[in-house]
Swiss-Prot record:
It catalyses: 2-C-methyl-D-erythritol 4-phosphate + CTP + H(+) = 4-CDP-2-C-methyl-D-erythritol + diphosphate. Catalyzes the formation of 4-diphosphocytidyl-2-C-methyl-D-erythritol from CTP and 2-C-methyl-D-erythritol 4-phosphate (MEP). It is an enzyme of class 2 (transferase). This is 2-C-methyl-D-erythritol 4-phosphate cytidylyltransferase. PROSITE patterns: ISPD. The gene is ispD. GO terms for biological process: isopentenyl diphosphate biosynthetic process, methylerythritol 4-phosphate pathway. Its EC number is 2.7.7.60. The record marks R14, K21 as: Transition state stabilizer. Belongs to the IspD/TarI cytidylyltransferase family. IspD subfamily. Pathway: Isoprenoid biosynthesis; isopentenyl diphosphate biosynthesis via DXP pathway; isopentenyl diphosphate from 1-deoxy-D-xylulose 5-phosphate: step 2/6. Pfam families: IspD.
Length: 226
């Protein structure tokens, strides 16, 4: 069984918006609608779990799932941090073989990216899409002076969905929970415990909508791509 966990817990602080970013309107529908639709329409995905803050569950059911006829398998309460939300969802997936973990604020994930996530997770147990940074990346010191310039061809900006053998990611999450280790994404979870992640070619259109500038780009994409 292949399962997808969609994380929709962003509060939209960088948007300057009181409304959670996954519910922001994008050409007549909330951002989360487009994200869920991509996974619902994918033939490789057997089960979908959506994670939202406890106090938004009723709103999400009413204004997203029911309003747009989106069928998922479970709606799970998120935690205070991203890794807690992932852990809560993993606990609902006892019989999965592969699990994909995706940001709800990435509505332009393609079917190709999802398919590759499943394929490479089966082959390598851990995989994620990534793109080369377009800008030169430097390391700076505490006084804001440059210290070093990194080799751009060796760098990659990791996207989602990040895909894993279920037992691997679940056991790794249990271990970092026990050790009280904080991480920013799920590839870091398995890497901290000695497992390599296969990185395949991502898509520059697979943006995470985080800032007002991202929303401008998203509005263009939804009118010209979706």
């Amino acid at each position: 069984m292949v399962s997808a966990i969609v994380l929709a817990g962003g509060r939209g602080k960088r948007m300057g918006n009181i409304q959670s970013k996954q519910y922001i309107d994008l050409n007549g529908a909330p951002i989360l609608y487009y994200t869920l639709k991509q996974f619902i329409e994918n033939d490789l995905i057997d089960k979908i779990i959506l994670v939202v803050p406890e106090d938004e569950k009723d709103y999400c059911k009413r204004e997203v799932l029911n309003k747009y006829g989106l069928k998922i398998d479970d709606l799970v309460s998120g935690g205070n941090e991203r890794q807690e939300s992932v852990y809560n969802a993993l606990e609902k997936l006892e019989k999965s073989d592969i699990v994909l973990i995706h940001d709800g604020a990435r509505p332009f994930v393609s079917q190709k990216i999802i398919n590759y996530a499943v394929e490479y997770a089966k082959r390598y147990k851990a995989a994620a899409p990534g793109v080369m940074p377009k800008d030169t990346i430097k390391i700076k010191d505490s006084n804001n002076f440059s210290v070093d310039t990194l080799v751009r061809s060796e760098l990659v900006a990791i996207q989602t969905p990040q895909a894993f053998d279920f037992n691997l990611i679940y056991e790794c999450h249990k271990e970092i929970k026990k050790r009280c280790i904080s991480v920013t994404d799920d590839t870091s979870v398995v890497e901290l415990l000695g497992h390599k992640v296969y990185i395949y070619e991502g898509d520059y259109k697979n943006i995470k909508i985080t800032t007002p500038e991202d929303l401008i780009l998203a509005e263009y994409f939804v009118k010209n791509i979706v």
